[in-house]
């Protein structure tokens, strides 16, 4: 936990010191991981919110990716981040559908499907049914679904047919360093 906590602190410190201004000037959203150890630390959460408050980046552009199971054990921290305007992305949404027995509307903004679940969805009826179930729960809860990384066009067709809201991966665009994106790319929509 101490290593994860230190890594979270370093990621946020480096982002706010080196990239937040450029990201804000482009008006693009950024998704950064937040570990369970970081989420459980009131000090780290407060530091994150302080850095956000002192940066030009609007909170609505900061998406925090947290493991899905952490939302219940650390609901207070998650709610604090959401009230500050941050978007919450629950990751590792996969075969364990029990989470939907406790997940309520307004607990998160996005559900990030497990990459393994999406990888061969075009040829696996069970994975397709699981994604369809997750998509239905997401709609009921007012959340958007994110799938990826996608490397085959056929997977995009299948995921789009299911109704997945957002898809990422090399078939959409090659991964690029953040510095390259904010300093050399053009964006038309904020």
Placement of each model-derived feature along the sequence:
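Short, contiguous acidic/charged loop-to-helix segments that flank catalytic cores in large enzymes
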Residues: 1-2, 6, 121-125
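Short charge-dense sequence patches
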Residues: 1-2, 26-30, 80-89
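Catalytic core of bacterial c-di-GMP phosphodiesterases, primarily the EAL and HD-GYP domains
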Residues: 5-76, 149
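Helix C-cap/helix->beta junction micro-motif
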Residues: 26, 55, 84, 140-141
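A short alpha-helix capping/helix-coil boundary motif
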Residues: 28, 56-58, 77-80, 112-114, ...
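EAL-family c-di-GMP phosphodiesterase catalytic domain
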Residues: 35-40, 61-72, 86-190
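Catalytic-core regions built around general acid/base machinery
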Residues: 47-54, 76-84, 129, 133-134
């Amino acid at each position: 936990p101490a290593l994860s906590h230190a890594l979270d602190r370093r990621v946020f410190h480096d982002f706010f010191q080196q990239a937040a201004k450029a990201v804000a000037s482009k008006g693009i959203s950024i998704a950064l991981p937040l570990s369970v150890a970081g989420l459980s630390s009131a000090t780290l959460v407060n530091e994150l919110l302080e850095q956000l408050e002192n940066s030009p980046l609007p909170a609505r552009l900061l998406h925090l990716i947290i493991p899905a199971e952490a939302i219940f054990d650390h609901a207070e921290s998650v709610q604090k981040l959401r009230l500050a305007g941050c978007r919450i992305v629950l990751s590792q949404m996969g075969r364990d559908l029990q989470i939907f027995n406790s997940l309520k509307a307004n607990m998160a903004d996005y559900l990030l499907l497990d990459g393994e679940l999406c990888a061969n969805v075009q040829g696996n009826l069970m994975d397709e049914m699981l994604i369809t179930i997750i998509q239905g729960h997401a709609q009921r809860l007012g959340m958007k679904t994110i799938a990826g990384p996608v490397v085959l066009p056929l997977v995009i067709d299948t995921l789009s047919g299911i109704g997945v809201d957002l898809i990422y991966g090399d078939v959409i665009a090659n991964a690029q360093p953040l510095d390259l994106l904010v300093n050399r790319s053009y964006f038309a929509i904020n």
